[in-house]
Amino acid sequence: MTISPPEREAKKVKIVVDRNPVETSLEKWAKPGHFSRALSKGPTTTTWIWNLHADAHDFDSHTSDLEDISRKVFSAHFGQLGIIFIWLSGMYFHGARFSNYEAWLSDPTHIKPSAQVVWPVVGQEILNGDVGGGFQGIQITSGFFQLWRASGITSELQLYATAIGGLVMAAAMFFAGWFHYHKAAPKLEWFQNVESMMNHHLAGLLGLGSLAWAGHQIHISLPINKLLDAGVDPKEIPLPHELMLNRELMAQLYPSFAKGLAPFFTLNWGEYSDFLTFQGGLNPVTGGLWLSDEAHHHLAIAVLFLIAGHQYRTNWGIGHSMKEILEAHKGPFTGEGHKGLYEILTTSWHAQLAINLAMLGSLSIIVAHHMYAMPPYPYLATDYGTQLSLFTHHVWIGGFCIVGAGAHAAIFMVRDYDPTNNYNNLLDRVIRHRDAIISHLNWVCIFLGFHSFGLYIHNDTMSALGRPQDMFSDTAIQLQPVFAQWVQNTHFLAPQLTAPNALAATSVSWGGDVVAVGGKVAMMPIALGTSDFLVHHIHAFTIHVTVLILLKGVLYSRSSRLIPDKANLGFRFPCDGPGRGGTCQVSAWDHVFLGLFWMYNSLSIVIFHFSWKMQSDVWGSVTASGVTHITGGNFAASANTINGWLRDFLWAQSSQVIQSYGSALSAYGLMFLGAHFVWAFSLMFLFSGRGYWQELIESIVWAHNKLKVAPAIQPRALSITQGRAVGVAHYLLGGIATTWSFFLARIISVG
């Protein structure tokens, strides 16, 4: 006998908003700390201002109503988008008003991009260097010029129009943020309707977004860039609306346009292969990816996401239910599997945010690697300053997101985790064997640390003793990265083997010939050797330590053998009360604090490796006699000792920033000095004792009382947690600005 299954319930999507839930009033803006009973009384001590900053955006502490918290977060997102549009508008406005974009467009290999002109106040005009084409300004390394050319922008007037459009969008975002909190605020069930959210984000944002960009690339970017590549004067190129409306004009450049949509509806899509290509490699004129490959990519991505956006069950009884998928996800050894995770992810926005930050951060680091290996925009590859800036930027952004993932995962564990709903599921099982996980991870870190540094120490010792034949190097004892070389070769051979329709490999870095643009190397095969093998294991070591610190913070955020009731103490606390020595700096917050230092450690070595490797083995000038690299291939010979890193990278390459005074790069010299100072200032907070400062403050207050000038607000030393926060902020700010000035002064001088 067959039993028909009960009819699957289909979620009926209703319009779920509350009308006018919160009146619009500016009065709260005049009451700092209005969200907290303690803070709204005003300051009695200087601790008040620190607590105000710490809690202003901690919506959890303002109310326990999940619906109101969700609305505040939703509204704040619109505010964030508004700020982003204003920033973007400012970038386009600078391109329109203060830049040499049109001159750069006419000669991108000789003229450098500039979109900032310094006003003379007391001699600052020295910063306006000669960037070519008779323009004086600061050389920029953001990549906007290359992006604008790829988009098909041919005049500064178009940049003006786009800048105004950005401000209009910003206004729309700010309005939406106000409207969806004060006028029509979504109910909690709207925020928790994950199937509808997935469908709309996948099909709308990613699917239609990619489709719109593919359409722009096909109808506007491709024809304009084809004409620019052929040397047509930007002023002679047809305007975008002409290209969109005049099919004959397009058919001259791409003959398949003459056939209209017939091949599309008869499924003969191959007819369009003149503008939807699969060439691989780089355009030899611009050193960027083929824009026709990019259009093809975005169209294919759009199709995939439009399909994906119809996967989840909403009003109709078909498609996936997220809860069913998660609860069906059981392995033979994992107990209840993912049961209970649906409830976590629909009621804890910290848990949701932790996963999204981990994914987005990892993606940002992947983007950093793709942007130099497969430069997406024309003339990006030969602009070495921009290449270095984009790599560094995406690596650091990724690192901050990943540490943020650790932070919010721990906040979820402390504030939102309910053990009763998580019995024997994967999360519970991970927490129950956390000792095994952390001790094994700790062993891995010790192993990697001693072995990777041990190889360097061996080399430094042998080098000092004058025994080069006993060193690990490409010329003595070789430690070749054979697996990486095999991966490179496999990808290089793909067009003949696994990807027969591609005309060339995805990236020139896999192998093949040098791509040179205007006498500079755009990209060439990257040979890996012993020095790369050594520093790779330093990367493995530092990344594993960062993960160890963050994961330990998450897994022990509610309890530990040392402090069994840690969950009651909250996310951040200095110590487990008086009389319990040795329990300081164990809060989940302190793990995030320590994780930030190791993230910075880890990624400094990544960007140093990239910077030196590219200058040594890739970037340089091309003449009839061959390639001359910036540092002449010294990476393989020098980067296998710690002394080599100190002498031939840090010391040798800092000469440009140290000697920049009196030149257009002098601001980088001052920044290098100032950022070192900011970094050193952080140590005052990190190595300090709170009692020392409290004692000092009280003697200073005594002096003020004597003179009858004592303040009404009593001064207090920073708490331990506040001191560490100020310390890590200045440590990272100082370190990042030091690296920024060091990199840019160097690469703008020699690149």
UniProtKB/Swiss-Prot annotation:
InterPro entries cross-referenced by the UniProt entry: PSI_PsaA (IPR006243), PSI_PsaA/B (IPR001280), PSI_PsaA/B_CS (IPR020586), PSI_PsaA/B_sf (IPR036408)
Membrane topology: Multi-pass membrane protein
Catalytic reaction list: reduced [plastocyanin] + hnu + oxidized [2Fe-2S]-[ferredoxin] = oxidized [plastocyanin] + reduced [2Fe-2S]-[ferredoxin]
Enzyme Commission number, as recorded: 1.97.1.12
Keywords assigned by UniProt, alphabetized: 4Fe-4S, Chlorophyll, Chloroplast, Chromophore, Electron transport, Iron, Iron-sulfur, Magnesium, Membrane, Metal-binding, Oxidoreductase, Photosynthesis, Photosystem I, Plastid, Thylakoid, Transmembrane, Transmembrane helix, Transport
Annotated positions binding phylloquinone: 693
Subcellular location: Plastid, Chloroplast thylakoid membrane
Gene Ontology MF terms: 4 iron, 4 sulfur cluster binding; chlorophyll binding; electron transfer activity; magnesium ion binding; oxidoreductase activity
GO biological process: photosynthesis
Listed transmembrane segments: 73-96, 159-182, 198-222, 294-312, 349-372, 388-414, 436-458, 533-551, 591-612, 665-687, 725-745
Coiled coil stretches, renumbered: none
Catalytic EC class: oxidoreductase
UniProt-annotated binding residues for chlorophyll a: 684, 692
Major location (coarse): plastid
Top-level taxon of the source organism: Eukaryota
Stated family: Belongs to the PsaA/PsaB family.
Purpose of the protein: PsaA and PsaB bind P700, the primary electron donor of photosystem I (PSI), as well as the electron acceptors A0, A1 and FX. PSI is a plastocyanin/cytochrome c6-ferredoxin oxidoreductase, converting photonic excitation into a charge separation, which transfers an electron from the donor P700 chlorophyll pair to the spectroscopically characterized acceptors A0, A1, FX, FA and FB in turn. Oxidized P700 is reduced on the lumenal side of the thylakoid membrane by plastocyanin or cytochrome c6.
Quaternary structure and interacting proteins, as annotated: The PsaA/B heterodimer binds the P700 chlorophyll special pair and subsequent electron acceptors. PSI consists of a core antenna complex that captures photons, and an electron transfer chain that converts photonic excitation into a charge separation. The eukaryotic PSI reaction center is composed of at least 11 subunits.
Protein name: Photosystem I P700 chlorophyll a apoprotein A1
Species of origin: Oltmannsiellopsis viridis
